[in-house]
């Protein structure tokens, strides 16, 4: 929320410098994000009046203007279409410096001398686009410094508003906080009722009755203020003060009617909408939920297909607005609009929450209605808007009409602020401060939280309670702790003494078989991987591509359409992160993540996953760059075996998973039980996701990585013997099957088996391969003899022949 100091001082004078005020607000829960001036730096720009404007003798699109800055007349060549005699505007004199370090010098344009430049709002950094030179009010003094005239050194404070404080998303809301924190008096603009048929700029037309309004969805919209203004001049530009305030708050000027409705949102926090009364079909509006097949053409140019739970405002021809989110084009105001119907409605937060984001819409209105708008603010807002419209665009007003749903007790069915009970003793216990009850009452009253029951004298009994009425604009005050928080904010969190904790803090024992998370993370970090932390909710489209047909938990109110389901795997988040890194020219990526996944119908599962893209090693001079492959990934995973005390404890079994390359993927096993997957991303998704090469992926259950402590084994004093064996096998045979056959047939003298060559070619049948094994034998008790070794080798050959149909090369 951007807050100009000049606008704030129209409500309350804090008596603090901007930085001091920002620090005080930060400690009260409204973090100061930035302080800036209302305009970029420039100098030497003054107010000037154009005395005459003649066509340039050498250029049709230029004018030669004679301008006055008070006691001096100057000749300026200008190309703006709106340059005309009598206009007061901004003149950059010779020697002036404009934004972007543009220095103004005397110049000759097409043979005519020009002693400066008449400036547009864009050239002064006051607008992104502009149609001509700046037009200033006729009453501003000639020769005055423009920065002083427009107060362009006005500090702009930008605050972060937390989701629970929708009431602070306005100048009024922040002014209330400033007044409460500083003790300064709170003022505000004139919001007194304006009677019907008040004459404005063009008297003579009768005030007309508003369109009829009905509330079919009364629980979602129990109150609807509306009023008609006729003979409005919406073609004139908004006054400079209004355009400037909108600009400083981060909005652009559109037209007087739209500007004023936007101004009310910023000033009071009440979203409102203006309809062209002549475009409302049937002369009536109804607030209801959308019907099947309905759509709405919105002001931003989009057409949305409306779901049945979307609240709309409709006329006889169908929806004209998404209630609380955005208006529609069909009834929008234009420069030709002369009859306007103003709407100030109260929508229940639950009826608006998430509806806009479902369609990719986040508007000023939806942000406020989702958090909760003061149900008692509507009348003040419509009166304030009416007064501004009469001032800016003229016209005649009709009466304010209110359509509302009445509860059984005869009161309006809008939200009723709750009463909250507070134990004064609890304030001291929670905050660690001595706080007499009368002090608590005084602090809360600054926030319009009034005591309605109980005794607040300093010596009140320990067990006594006080009851407070929560103000209608505070949706976040419902329980005792909320009141205690308000007391803490006003006293200042920095005033709460620091007291060392005295509670016993038992430390839970960690099972010896459980792998410490930090050791797991350190292992991958030491092998060149970088840890990532990603959202637990992911893109439903990407997740369906990777795991087609697998159900996911869908969020009812996602923060974005591409973060709408809970993840079934760590891979969607890792792949998105890899894409973002590649877009930022990171050619070699090694990302891993430790987190939980959320299968439907099962508990959360703790997983470790990773993605690798690019070269095997970082680029270097000593060797050519080679892409990483499955075996590089496998080597990193096998290092986990040593971490859990079981070198080689992870097995890799050839298997297929839909999202992985069918010939370059494996199921990961531990002790014969599946614990994860590893492999290349399927070529289809490599292409569709735009990867330059196939990413390598792995994921496994952390719970399977239990630690097995090694058992002491005495080192043999006797020599090792090596024998090599060339085994001819079917092409599809795996090393794990060979290893299994060798180890099961050995008597226990075999210490190590490894592959040192694989051969295909002359002398080997098609469809078969020769795998050369190195076999290391050793006995603990004696030196091995040839007879013993030959017996071992014979047993191994027999086992491989029987199990794998192997033959042997000499």
Q: Model-predicted segments: where are they?
A:
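A carboxyl-terminal module marker
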Residues: 20, 27, 446-449, 467, ...
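Short, hydrophobic beta-strand segments
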Residues: 2-8, 154-162, 222-230, 364-372, ...
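Phosphate-backbone binding interfaces of nucleic-acid-interacting proteins
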Residues: 1-206, 341, 357-360, 364, ...
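Terminal amphipathic helices with adjacent charged low-complexity linkers/tails
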Residues: 182-216, 392-427, 433-434, 483
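Mobile "lid/hinge" segments at catalytic clefts and subdomain interfaces of large enzymes
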Residues: 110-123, 130-135, 146-151, 155, ...
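Extended, well-folded interaction surfaces typified by the phenylalanyl-tRNA synthetase beta subunit core
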Residues: 420-589, 723, 776-778, 788-810
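Glycine/proline-enriched, intrinsically flexible loops and inter-domain linkers
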Residues: 4-5, 23, 63, 182, ...
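Conserved mixed alpha/beta core segments that line enzyme active sites in large multi-domain catalysts
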Residues: 47-77, 143, 243-244, 261-330
């Amino acid at each position: 929320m951007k807050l100009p100091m000049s606008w704030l001082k129209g409500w309350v004078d804090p008596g603090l410098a901007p930085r001091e005020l920002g620090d005080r607000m930060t400690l009260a829960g409204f973090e100061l994000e930035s302080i800036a001036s209302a305009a970029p730096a420039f100098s030497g720009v003054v107010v000037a009046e154009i005395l005459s404007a003649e066509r340039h003798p050498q250029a049709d699109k230029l004018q030669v203007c004679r301008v006055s800055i008070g006691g001096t007349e100057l000749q300026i060549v200008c190309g703006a279409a709106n340059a005309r005699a009598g206009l007061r505007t901004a003149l950059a004199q010779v020697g002036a410096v404009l934004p972007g370090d543009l220095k103004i010098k005397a110049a000759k344009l097409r043979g005519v001398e020009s002693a400066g430049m008449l400036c547009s709002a864009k050239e002064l950094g006051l607008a992104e686009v502009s149609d001509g030179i700046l037009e200033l009010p006729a009453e501003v003094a000639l020769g005055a410094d423009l920065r002083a005239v427009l107060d362009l050194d006005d500090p702009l404070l930008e605050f972060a508003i937390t989701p629970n404080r929708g009431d602070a998303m306005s100048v009024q809301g922040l002014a209330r906080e400033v007044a409460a924190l500083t003790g300064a008096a709170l003022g505000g603009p004139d919001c007194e009722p304006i009677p019907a048929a008040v004459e404005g700029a063009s008297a003579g037309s009768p005030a007309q009755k508003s369109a009829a309004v009905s509330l079919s969805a009364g629980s979602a919209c129990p109150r609807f203020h509306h009023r008609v203004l006729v003979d409005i001049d919406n073609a004139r530009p908004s006054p400079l003060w209004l355009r400037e305030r909108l600009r400083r708050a981060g909005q652009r000027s559109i037209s007087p009617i739209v500007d004023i409705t936007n101004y009310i949102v910023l000033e009071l926090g009440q979203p409102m909408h203006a309809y062209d009364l002549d475009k409302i079909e049937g002369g009536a509006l109804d607030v209801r939920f959308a019907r099947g097949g309905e759509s709405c053409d919105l002001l931003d140019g989009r057409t949305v297909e409306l779901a049945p739970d979307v609240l709309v405002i409709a006329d006889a021809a169908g929806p004209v607005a998404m209630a609380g989110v955005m208006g529609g084009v069909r009834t929008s105001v234009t420069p030709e609009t002369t009859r306007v119907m103003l709407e100030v409605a109260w929508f229940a937060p639950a009826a608006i929450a998430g509806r806009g984001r479902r369609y990719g819409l986040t508007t000023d209105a939806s942000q406020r209605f989702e958090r909760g708008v003061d149900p008692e603010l509507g009348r003040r807002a419509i009166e304030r808007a009416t007064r501004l419209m009469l001032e800016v665009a003229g016209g005649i007003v009709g009466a304010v009409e209110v359509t509302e749903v009445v509860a059984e007790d005869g009161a309006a069915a809008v939200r009723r602020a709750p009463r909250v009970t507070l134990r004064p003793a609890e304030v001291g216990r929670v905050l660690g401060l001595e706080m007499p009850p009368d002090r608590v009452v005084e602090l809360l009253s600054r926030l319009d939280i009034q005591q309605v029951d109980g005794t607040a004298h300093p010596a009140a009994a320990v067990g006594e309670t006080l009851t407070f009425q929560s103000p209608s604009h505070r949706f976040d005050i419902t329980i005792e702790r909320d009141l205690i928080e308000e007391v803490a904010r006003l006293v200042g969190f920095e005033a709460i003494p620091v007291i060392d904790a005295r509670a016993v803090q038992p430390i839970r024992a960690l099972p010896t078989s459980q792998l410490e998370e930090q050791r797991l993370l350190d292992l991958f970090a030491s092998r060149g991987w970088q840890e990532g932390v990603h959202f637990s909710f992911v893109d439903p489209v990407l997740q369906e591509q990777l795991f087609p047909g697998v159900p996911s938990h869908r969020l009812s109110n996602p923060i974005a359409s591409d973060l709408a389901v809970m993840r079934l795997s760590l891979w969607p988040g890792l792949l998105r992160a890899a894409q973002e890194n590649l877009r930022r020219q990171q050619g070699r990526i090694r990302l891993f993540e430790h987190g939980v996944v959320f299968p439907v119908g099962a508990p959360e599962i703790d997983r470790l996953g990773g993605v690798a893209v690019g070269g095997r090693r970082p680029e270097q001079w000593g060797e050519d760059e080679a892409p990483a492959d499955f075996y590089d990934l496998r080597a990193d995973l096998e290092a986990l075996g040593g971490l859990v005390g079981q070198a080689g404890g992870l097995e890799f079994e050839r298997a297929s998973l839909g999202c992985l390359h069918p010939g370059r993927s494996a199921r990961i096993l531990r002790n014969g039980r599946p614990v994860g997957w590893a492999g290349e991303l399927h070529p289809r998704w490599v292409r569709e996701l735009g990867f330059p090469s196939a990413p390598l992926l792995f994921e496994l259950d952390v719970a399977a990585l239990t630690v097995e402590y090694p058992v002491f084994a005495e080192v043999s004093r006797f020599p090792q013997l090596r024998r090599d064996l060339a085994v001819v096998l079917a092409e599809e045979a795996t090393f794990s099957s060979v290893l299994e056959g060798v180890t099961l047939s050995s008597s226990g003298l075999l210490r190590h088996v490894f592959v040192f060559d694989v051969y295909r070619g002359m002398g080997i049948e098609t469809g078969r391969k020769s795998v050369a094994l190195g076999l290391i034998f050793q006995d603990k008790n004696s030196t091995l003899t040839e007879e013993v070794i030959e017996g071992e080798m014979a047993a191994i050959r027999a086992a491989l022949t029987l199990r794998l149909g192997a033959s042997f090369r000499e």
